[in-house]
């Protein structure tokens, strides 16, 4: 759907739908040094595993973990069983190419890929935040797991407020960068992608997650039908007056 309306997205390498297909993982990722395994119906960033490289014995995750083949196969199996899905329902495992993320945010994010979440109401960007990975979050840009959320002005992209664990902060806990110095290149393009997500899905209220690839520019990672309330905490104010 995204490709049909010219929205950049990571390439889908493969899909594992059944337990008997788990053993085919290595064949699916052949030719890819780095990739991402994620549940199709996950929430809160649960179940997302970013593999940076692998050899004949181990997989190496973006968070620095060394995983055996058995560990990763079990992770995929758990995904299919619904361990990470909403309501614990049976799920499928999506395998995508990893984003070659831009280094413009290297001072603001610890290891993992930072992303921009655009809340879109009836096709119009209403609130925006950037989520920055930390050591505590394991390199994941997820506020529930300890990432930093920075509320951004929709019109300018300038930082307005920053939080971690629902508390206001000024510096990134690991890099010590001043979060008010954060700037997002291609700001207009981020907002356009968010608006196009409405055209693609028809959802009156959604959250579009967008990352900045070094070579391809802004790319949409996913669209959330229930994006949650964390963005209001990142802004330090509610969304009622914006909808």
Regions found by a protein language model. Name each.
Residues 1-47, 69, 82:
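A conserved helix-loop-beta module that forms one wall/lid of the active-site cleft
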Residues 6, 93-103, 189-195:
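Short Pro/Gly-enriched beta-strand edge/turn motifs at strand-loop
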Residues 33, 61-164:
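Phosphate-binding site of ATP-dependent enzymes
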Residues 48, 136-145, 172-173, 230-235:
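A short, polar/proline- and glycine-enriched secondary-structure boundary/capping micro-motif
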Residues 52-56, 120-124, 154-156, 213-216:
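Short acidic-glycine loop/turn motifs at beta-strand connectors
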Residues 117, 209-211:
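Short, surface-exposed charged micro-motifs
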Residues 150-179, 194:
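Intrinsically disordered, low-complexity Ser/Thr/Pro/Gly-rich regulatory segments
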Residues 171-189, 198-203, 212-243:
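C-terminal active-site "lid" helix and adjoining low-complexity regulatory extension at the edge
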């Amino acid at each position: 759907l995204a490709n049909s309306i010219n929205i950049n997205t990571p390439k889908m390498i493969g899909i594992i739908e059944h337990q008997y297909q788990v053993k085919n993982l290595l064949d699916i990722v052949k030719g890819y040094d780095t990739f991402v395994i994620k549940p199709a119906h996950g929430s809160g960033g649960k179940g997302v595993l970013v593999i940076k490289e692998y050899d004949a014995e181990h997989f190496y995750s973006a968070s620095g973990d060394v995983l055996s083949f058995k560990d990763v196969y079990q992770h995929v199996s758990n995904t299919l069983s619904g361990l990470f899905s909403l309501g614990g329902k049976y799920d499928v495992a999506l395998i995508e190419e990893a984003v070659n993320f831009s280094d413009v945010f290297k001072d603001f994010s610890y290891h993992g890929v930072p992303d921009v979440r655009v809340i879109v109401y009836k096709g119009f960007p209403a609130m925006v935040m950037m989520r920055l990975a930390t050591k505590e979050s394991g390199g994941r840009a997820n506020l529930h797991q300890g990432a930093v959320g920075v509320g951004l002005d929709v019109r300018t992209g300038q930082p307005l407020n920053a939080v971690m664990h629902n508390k206001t902060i000024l510096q990134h806990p690991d890099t010590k960068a001043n979060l008010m110095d954060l700037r997002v290149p291609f700001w207009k393009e981020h907002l356009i992608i968010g608006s196009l997500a409405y055209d693609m899905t028809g959802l009156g209220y959604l959250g579009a997650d967008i990352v900045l690839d070094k070579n391809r520019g802004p790319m949409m990672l996913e669209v959330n039908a229930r994006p949650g309330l964390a963005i209001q905490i990142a802004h330090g104010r509610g969304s009622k007056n914006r909808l």
